[in-house]
Swiss-Prot record:
The lineage of its organism: Bacteria, Pseudomonadati, Pseudomonadota, Betaproteobacteria, Burkholderiales. SUPFAM superfamilies: Tryptophan synthase beta subunit-like PLP-dependent enzymes (SSF53686). It comes from Acidovorax sp. (strain JS42). GO terms for molecular function: D-serine ammonia-lyase activity; hydro-lyase activity; pyridoxal phosphate binding. Belongs to the serine/threonine dehydratase family. DsdA subfamily. This is Probable D-serine dehydratase.
Length: 451
């Protein structure tokens, strides 16, 4: 077990920690990462494996006929919730890459239907898992049920069963959208506890779909705690716990299976001579941890995942630096947790996610809000894609890795530098599809004003 280290201990000999405390962009590399991932990984007193990821993917597949009927936007995909893999060579300079440092791609979760963000993966999976469990309990499904049986869960009899139950969640925005929209569409009573960071348009989108929005004056941690406490008083309430849920995490992990096929279809090889670097925005940590777990299980030693966080809200970097046995907050480091990247405005990381990532994660880096807005505009100008500020966080990753002494030293130490020209850099964009035009116009205006 790594030692528990306080912020003060770090400041004396750890340059990234000193930069972090000054709210300066920095790169931290994980000294506990294992090159070869174990087949079974410990998390929250349990163990998970590729088998659990495949079970989550199978659940999505079973529910596809129902989802196709409930959500018109899924008719074209047969009920499959997925995002494209986009080439992004026009963003090389914006990402800090120069010629000979690999190819750049975008995993465009900002286009995910239904929820419009990466949260469609984990959030909808947990709602589906709950619906399946209740349907089995009430005789609406059997283990032998076929597509027609799942499609019938949209019928009045099934909706009457689901209507007895409440699905609740605490969120800064995107997870609330995912849970609220999916739960209400199936007939559940949906309650979303929103922190002060949540954008007004996200609250309105939920209310328009019949979701109860409870606004809190405090931060993400407070909204989650309030939602958890309220749900605990009602035996017919299911609380989706973003800080602790394995169902969420495994729902995210299923993305790795589809990405593996997308990489093959694009002719992208991932092996010792062709490393894959993945850059994932990180809030409490469940989504990027789930995806990283899935990718390490599927692609093994040759995928290297990095989490991106705002300079004022680096809760995961703080947690990874401290190690197991501690649970620090960004406030402990003199940081404010104030950022325009609302989905990343989290003061304290998920402990299960941090435990899972200790042997799997390559590192973390932080970015300024101004950088997010500049890069949002660069993405628009280069590709035409419209993303939220938080979705731009990963774009700084390649530059940290290839353009800083810390990053280059790590690449050499890992034996990756000689293979950089054959590498693939994958920036995972996390939200943007449903941003109202007037809100996006303000994002763009700020980004262009920054130059």
């Amino acid at each position: 077990m790594p030692s528990v280290v306080s912020p003060q201990d770090h400041l004396q000999d750890d340059a990234p920690a000193a930069q972090l405390r000054r709210a300066e962009p920095c790169l931290w590399l994980n000294p506990h990462r294992q090159p070869i991932p174990a087949a079974r990984q410990a998390v929250a007193g349990d163990h998970i494996s590729l088998d659990d990821t495949e079970k989550a993917a199978a659940r999505f597949a079973r529910f596809a006929p129902l989802l196709e009927g409930v959500f018109p936007e899924l008719q074209a995909t047969g009920g499959v919730i997925e995002s494209p893999l986009l080439p992004a060579s026009s963003l090389h300079a914006a990402a800090g890459l120069v010629a000979g440092q690999g190819a750049l791609w975008i995993k465009a979760d900002h286009r995910l239907p239904v929820a419009g963000s990466i949260k469609a993966r984990g959030g909808i999976h947990e709602v589906l898992e709950l619906a399946e469990r209740l349907a089995l309990q009430h005789g609406l499904l059997t283990p032998q049920s076929d597509a027609d049986d799942y499609r019938a869960l949209a019928n009045p009899a099934a909706r009457a069963v689901f209507a007895r139950y409440t699905v609740a969640v605490g969120s800064t925005g995107n997870l609330g959208l995912s849970i609220g929209v999916a739960a209400s569409a199936l007939g559940f009573h949906a309650v979303v506890h929103m922190s002060a960071d949540a954008k007004e348009w996200k609250k309105q989108r939920l209310r328009q779909r019949g979701v109860q929005v409870v606004e809190h004056a405090g931060d993400y941690e407070g909204a989650v705690a309030a939602g958890r406490a309220q749900a605990a008083q009602d035996p017919f309430s299911h609380f989706v716990d973003d800080e602790r849920s394995l169902s969420l995490l495994l729902g995210y992990s299923a993305a790795a299976l589809h990405l593996r096929q997308q990489l093959r279809d694009a002719g992208i090889v991932v092996d010792a001579q062709h490393p894959l670097f993945v850059y994932l925005p990180c809030g409490v940590g469940g989504a990027p941890a789930g995806i990283t777990f899935g990718l390490r299980q599927v692609l093994g030693a040759h995928v290297h995942c990095f989490f991106a966080e705002p300079v004022q809200s680096p809760c995961f970097m703080v947690q990874m630096m401290a190690g197991q046995g501690a649970h620090p907050s960004v406030y402990d480091w003199g940081l404010t947790n104030r950022t325009e990247a609302d989905g990343l405005a989290v003061p304290r990381a998920s402990l299960p996610a941090a435990e899972l990532m200790e042997p799997l994660l390559a590192g973390c880096f932080t970015v300024c809000d101004d950088t997010l807005f500049r890069q949002l505009v660069q993405v628009l100008d280069a590709t035409g894609e419209r993303i939220e500020p938080s979705a731009a966080a990963g774009l700084s990753g390649p530059g940290f890795l290839t353009g800083t002494e810390t990053g280059r030293t790590w690449l050499h130490a890992q034996g990756l530098w000689p293979h950089l020209a054959q590498a693939t850099h994958l920036v995972w964009t996390t939200g943007g599809l449903y941003v109202p035009p007037e809100a996006y116009a303000r994002f763009e205006e700020r980004g262009r004003a920054l130059g």
